[in-house]
């Protein structure tokens, strides 16, 4: 079973932050230390802030636990939703999978500054970063999708023992019509996004398909 806590996961400190520190982090960074009178009313409780933030296009966070272990960290922003899956490797928490969903047309925003939502307020899977770790080789695959059926792919391999690395970049054609998914309906309606195996084309995680541009 999943459990949601509206708390910040601190990768540097390798821990889930307290409610007080989570809210202070939102005040300091997101609100630039200047919350207004209305915001202050909700900044005394992390879940109440999440409810307010969802309805008012503000930033909030949540750490997802599965069977009492840390499973994922979600950052909700007005224009994007970031999902970082969490695992343990050699005694440290790592992010083996990172998903970025756009809530608005990023190209239109950077071109004109206008906020243009997708049809039905759907989300668009804009990026995937998939990492695998072994003592001999670490692999990172990053895919950035565009709305015009193109994707930028970066394949990186590092060899810790030899202290060597190599990277390959390429542009590929891809049918991004499959990248759309419904938007959350409530402040706590995010668990369905964790089911990436059913939400996302399996080919996006297939190194052979990516290498041959067969997407």
What is each model feature region?
Residues 1-49, 120-215:
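Long terminal segments
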Residues 56-63, 80-86, 111-114, 141:
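A structural detector for short beta-strand units
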Residues 61-68, 72:
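Conserved beta-hairpin
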Residues 65, 86-89, 118, 145-146, ...:
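Conserved anchor residues at repeat-unit boundaries in beta-strand-based tandem repeats, strongest
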Residues 74-79, 84, 95-103, 130, ...:
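Beta-turn initiation residues at beta-strand->coil junctions
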Residues 82-85, 105-112, 164-168:
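A short, polar/proline- and glycine-enriched secondary-structure boundary/capping micro-motif
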Residues 89-144:
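An exposed acidic His-Trp-rich patch
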